[in-house]
Amino acid sequence: MKRRIALCIAVSLCAGVYAGNNPGIYKKGWIDFNKNGVKDIYEDPSAPIEARVQDLLSQMTLEEKTCQMATLYGSGRVLKDSLPTEKWKDEIWKDGIANIDEQANGLGRFGSSLSYPYVNSVENRQTIQRWFVEQTRLGIPVDFTNEGIRGLCHDRATMFPAQCGQGATWNKELISEIAQVTAEEAKALGYTNIYSPILDIAQDP
C-alpha cells in the first residue's frame, strides 16, 4: 500500500497540467487535493515522502484504501464510459481507484476513435485524471497502466514478437532495445506503469 501511495504522490507532482473544472484547488506550488483550503502534509511537495504517505493514509477510509488495491479495466470493458459522467459519483471508484488499465489504446468497443490521432489518446487520459484529482474526496491521481508484453498495447504502437519468441532469442541486448521503444512510446502517450513480458514462460511450470 505504501508503494502505491508513494506512486500516487509522484504522479501528483505532474498533476498541475490537468487544471480544469475545479481551478480553486491549484495553488502556487501545491494542489489542495482534499479541497479543505489547508496545505496538508501529503499535499506539500517539500515534505518527506514517508511523511506524505503517512498523512494520506491517516485520512483514508477503509473503502478508499481498498479501492487503491484495485484495477479498473478501461476502453469500454468494465469502464463503459469514454469520459467521466455524473454516474461516476455513484460508482465504486467515486473516491478513487488504483489504476485504469489499457484506457484509450484503440482496443475495446471504442476502437481507434480514442487512440488516434495520438492527441486523442493523451487528452482522454488527462480528462479522466482531472476528474480523479478534482472530483474525488482526497484527489488521489489514478495510475494509467498498460501491457508491454510485445510492445505497448496500443493499436498505433510498435509491435514486436510475442513474449515467448523474445525469450527464445536469449538476446538481452535486443530485449533491452524492445523495452526502450516500449517505454518511450508509453511515456509519450501518458501511460505511467507498463507490465513487462514473461520471457521464460515456456520453462515456467
Question: Would you name each region that the model predicts?
Answer:
Residues 1-2, 63:
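Intrinsically disordered, low-complexity sequence elements enriched in Ser/Thr/Gly/Pro
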Residues 20-205:
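N-terminal beta-rich core of secreted/periplasmic extracellular enzymes
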Residues 3, 15, 199-200:
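Short, intrinsically disordered/low-complexity patches at protein termini
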Residues 11-19:
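Hydrophobic h-region of N-terminal signal peptides that target proteins for export
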Residues 8-10, 71:
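A periodicity- and composition-biased signal for non-globular, repetitive helical segments
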Residues 2-8:
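Sec-dependent signal peptide recognition
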